[in-house]
């Protein structure tokens, strides 16, 4: 368990966190890269290829926060890592991430949270951070 973790980016970050909550006996660490806390409205999803911008779905964000709050005790023995950039879609993540941080801090859950200035929601930026994520899990 200590040597097995799960890492995901964007909605994959949500999936990684969910897998860890649902299977706490399996995963020792969880990495959430540019976690897509904000959801997406179906109307925004349909025009995304043309507009290339979303504002998110507050009800989805609140539901995710509630789910984590209700299950935070399942994360108590895991190493957690969260990050996001400051540009593009990633610019929407700071406030929801801060709410998640409050939940984790209130439950005395240990986690690492990093902000990467000028990083956008793109695989090339995720890749630049991957080594640092692994080193955090190995060193802690």
Segments and roles (model prediction):
Residues 1-140:
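Non-catalytic cap/lid and distal C-terminal segments of serine-dependent acyl enzymes
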